[in-house]
């Protein structure tokens, strides 16, 4: 029998984006071919997908470190890098994804349902993509963005219709073994069941699933016994069944006290839940009472004495014996009726319309109103920290060994309004400024509030502005001179050139 694992911690690392290429076209008869560096490919995502053939999280316990493929680098001749392959992890239905802060990222219940838990980094732009009318031959490219790295917790909550709860040795495992084909471990000592058991019960060409969780004892909410950890497997159930040992020999125990103690523990568990499982409060779930071991002497007498008090709960009461196999059919049909009623309610309840609005990566407004914040570093007076998703990405994608790339970054920050915001925050020339984890000594390019455009933008190739190549006009005059149509004279510096028509 495979080991049942219902909670694991995964260490995820999505693929890094590939670097852009810094290349110039070199081809015969193509002078000044221009930049032709391709873009890097995006890194691969890490995706969780529900697979109904998977029933446990066991595989992840031995392989908790997960890494997706990085994107390939760009190349010359405008060749873009390939995107890294997405890594898909198959999880069982009922898997809940929780981040490091305890927030639920996704609740995966439907077969084929997918969620991206770690996003790959964007590929860097090649110098061909960075070229513009004012930056015709960039001598740099952008680096790939690192992929998302995080730790997530996967919790499995069984998708059972009926949940069996009760004290240890109440006969829960025996009941699931006689109602279904499941073969759980059964022994005559407490806490025989250390992991949930699932079984499928057939009734009139219909089926429902039943879950047996480890036994509860008073004080379980405080950590006694196995605690309340396994109760997550009954959060999604349509009905809770109290399995009570009607033949308990302990003088301080009886069916009525057992049920009250169990309800107290369930109430404590529900109070600790941050959100329900979509079926409402666990305390309001339908319940039935199952008095087990009615084949034992004095069990009938004990049940008769407690029946009037048990009826005050207002729940159906069933007397069964898993050994003699009595009362099982009545119980089976009653549970099936409750499950069917629940399924009708779920089918008739329209699902809320979910409107997905993608989160914008860039600023809501362009220019100096980019989405970033500037605040003073409390640990270093006089220093400042700039935070913003897009600003941080610019830092990560800058090659700080390339002066032209650094200048391009400075231009972008100035156009985004970072310099003006730093002035307003009180920064002066030489102040330490931290952006994206990298600290600079601030050297402002422009005076605050003044729009200054440099004569030559960074990344602009001056060779394209100044050339010694002969112009078409000069070639025409030289041709006329060779044919004797005109006579050309060259004078020294400072004198005006003069052309006299040749008289022959």
From Swiss-Prot:
Residues the entry annotates as binding Mg(2+) = 173, 193
What cofactor(s) does the depicted protein rely on? Answer: Mg(2+)
Q: Where in the cell is it found?
A: Cytoplasm
Biological process terms from the Gene Ontology for this record are: ribosome biogenesis
Q: Broadest EC class? A: hydrolase
Q: Please report the stretch or stretches of sequence annotated as the OCT domain.
A: 364-444
Q: Which domain of life is it from?
A: Bacteria
Q: Where is the composition biased (Basic and acidic residues)?
A: 458-476
Where is each OBG-type G domain found? 160-340
What are the Obg domain coordinates in residue numbering? 2-159
| CDD domains referenced in this protein's UniProt entry, alphabetically | Obg
The UniProt keywords, alphabetically, are:
Cytoplasm, GTP-binding, Hydrolase, Magnesium, Metal-binding, Nucleotide-binding
Q: Which GO terms describe its cellular component?
A: cytoplasm
Region annotated Disordered, chain positions: 68-88, 449-481
Family statement drawn from the similarity comment of this UniProt entry: Belongs to the TRAFAC class OBG-HflX-like GTPase superfamily. OBG GTPase family.
Q: What does this protein do?
A: An essential GTPase which binds GTP, GDP and possibly (p)ppGpp with moderate affinity, with high nucleotide exchange rates and a fairly low GTP hydrolysis rate. Plays a role in control of the cell cycle, stress response, ribosome biogenesis and in those bacteria that undergo differentiation, in morphogenesis control.
Question: Partners and quaternary state?
Answer: Monomer.
| Protein name per its UniProtKB record | GTPase Obg
Organism of origin is Corynebacterium urealyticum (strain ATCC 43042 / DSM 7109)
Primary gene name: obg
